[in-house]
Amino acid sequence: MFKTNVEQNNVPVFGSFESGQDLPEKRMNKESVDPRIAYQLVKDQLIDEGSARQNLATFCQTYMEPEAEQIMAETMEKNAIDKSEYPQTAKLESSCVNMLADLWNVDESEHYMGTSTVGSSEACMLGGMAMKFRWRSAALKNGLDIHAKKPSLVISSGYQVCWEKFCVYWDIELREVPMSEEHLSINTDIIMDYVDEYTIGIVGILGITYTGKFDDIMTLNDLVEDYNNTHDNEVVIHVDGASGAMFTPFVEPGLEWDFRLPNVVSINTSGHKYGLVYPGVGWILWRDKEYLPEELVFDVSYLGGHMPTMAINFSRSASQIIGQYYNFLRFGYEGYRQIHMRTRDGALQLSQAVAETGLFEIYNDGANLPIVCYKLKDDANVAWTLYDLADRLQMKGWQVPAYPLPKEMGNTIIQRYVCRGDLGQNMVTAFKNDLSESIEELNNAHILYHDVNTSKTHGFTH
């Protein structure tokens, strides 16, 4: 039974009774534990996890400055929803929304609205709901039978899973425009074939999770414009900018994907990706209040004042919001640009190293978004797979995913590196060396064939 020696306050951590016991898993321990000991035991429980800084699978930020960590730690107790109790926190959130509206080129004549969320998944849910409610209102006004069939959402098959969740939760038909070797982002040649009077909207992705590719949102806007000129039911665009919307404005400000395009009505992003904040904080903005139906804005009075709220989640710490504002203040536009340009340079170095092996076909080189994505060439003539390479890199501490592309391209296995703001030049150089060594080790490994009469599976001896 897990218990404590409360009398021995000065006992060494590893001389304590608790250090000789397994940590509780199914039932809470009866007695309290000295905080020093509890801290060390929990810390040790996490000791065999991978290094977050070497995790090239995640988009999420894994480094913040000590001052940012300090201000976030000092504000963890603040409840973001309690805006009457914490009016200055609410003001910082509003300031972040204003800065994003400026970054995404909202027209001064429009009355934009926005909110923080726990991440892009919640933000996507809000954007999807706004499109559905607005479609339903317009459909009823136009005399369309809204019960004749499900409303639909059109998106590339390279979507993030939150969109599938949205469609399941709110009973929407998910119409996927298939990816192909020729179209690794949304296929604008055929996308309008998926649109009809029951379509609530189209999602353009600024940074597809699988490959890092950008949908051509400018062309998509033109197609939607032509459609709306000849149909009663207006179709709108939501931009899923979870990754790209906090990166592209700083490195490619001339690219038109945002509110400069008249049919883009809402944009979401993840502050905990290229907004450079620890998880989790996201943002969503609507270009004008007409695109956020009134029934999705709720008035909360029982926290001590009448405050509108539009988020799905309720109580959560305001520390990430404050961390986002700290970054905006600390870095400014030029600081973000410098960080992101250096991050992109690191991605380009990695893609060059991959290309120089002669073994891989690169799908994304990191020039648009610092995501490097590639597959083995059909004529690579190697006995190992990308899964083997991922395993070998993991032995050196790097977490690098290998996975199949969506559905129609499910037989294509790719590998992806996500370069974040904390991937410094020393880490880029170390990874290039480890990649080269891993490939050499795989090429020189002795292969053990398990069954000569079936397709070859193999392991490596050392």
Curated annotation (Swiss-Prot):
Q: Which residues carry this modification: N6-(pyridoxal phosphate)lysine?
A: 273
InterPro entries linked to this entry: Glutamate_decarboxylase, PyrdxlP-dep_de-COase, PyrdxlP-dep_Trfase, PyrdxlP-dep_Trfase_major
User: What cofactor is needed?
Assistant: pyridoxal 5'-phosphate
The record's top EC class is lyase
**Which UniProt keywords are given for this protein, alphabetically ordered?**
Decarboxylase, Lyase, Pyridoxal phosphate
Note whether Amino-acid biosynthesis occurs among the keywords: no
The record's comment on protein family reads: Belongs to the group II decarboxylase family.
This protein is called Glutamate decarboxylase alpha
Its source organism is: Listeria monocytogenes serovar 1/2a (strain ATCC BAA-679 / EGD-e)
Question: Which lineage?
Answer: Bacteria, Bacillati, Bacillota, Bacilli, Bacillales
Gene it is expressed from: gadA
